[in-house]
């Protein structure tokens, strides 16, 4: 095949708006997929310095990916509490993993730097608009216009409205946490607490999430599934109350603070708004709506999409993105989110029942969008089946609309 000529008027072959998880993962994936030697990647990010010190990605290690070396902690047991009840589960060969943002950034940027002038990062520049043309795309930024053959848009979408219009479920997973260090050994290092619902439910679905890094140090987060964000004082008070109850007498030093907001929505995503623009990351639908997990979804997408982009660069064409998830998993997420909206008071019991009754390997796959049809049926059978069945009927219009 004859390589298309390099267009000297182009600033890059692939322009990526945003150098976060999805943008950096795709850039690395393009190199790994055999991007032509004369092709260039340009990442455009509004930050003056790229840093992931304020974020963490966690996941069940079910999918091989390029960032295994960035994993700092693995937990072979995971714990859920609801009132006086608690369950600890594990599955052979499956760990719950943590990648700190700074480790991910360091590894990704090191890999991109090794590519030399083929990869460039523009700092302190905001992408404002992307416009497809016949053989190129214009990327309008705060400092001028850039031209490329393809553009990937990882800019975060606007948070969905919390208004209930009867068409979509719009919840938010929002959290605030602290990395804490105690002078005494107070944390069980081999077990991650994914959900402790034995906390106030005054503001909606609420749990504490705990990742122990060692016996003295842990990330403790207050997490809500609700329609609106809350004042910082609510999260902080929840953490303080949990520490007083679960670790009485311990003295803690705050090492760092992190917070975040993840949309849990049934609103449809448009990952391919124009022939030469593809949305990636949250904007592309690469966050599982019912759980908020994103890391593996992004890596799966990169694995499937990067070869398509490489082929498009060689042929001079466009690259159609693969679906973010299957119609089956989309339908299940829609039903489950509708259930959480209709029955928020039942959420602690439902989540606890899932961890208690569903085989842990099956549940890990389900939460990570790696489940088989048999896995999904098992989860539905072991959950709040009558209420979920009713919610499936209520959510049928949403499911049909998303399947179009």
Language-model features: locations:
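FAD-binding beta-loop-beta segment adjacent to the flavin cofactor pocket
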Residues: 202-205, 260-280, 339-347, 352-355
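Flavin-binding catalytic cores
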Residues: 228-258, 275-278, 300-324
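N-terminal FAD cofactor-binding segment of flavoenzymes
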Residues: 29-85, 103
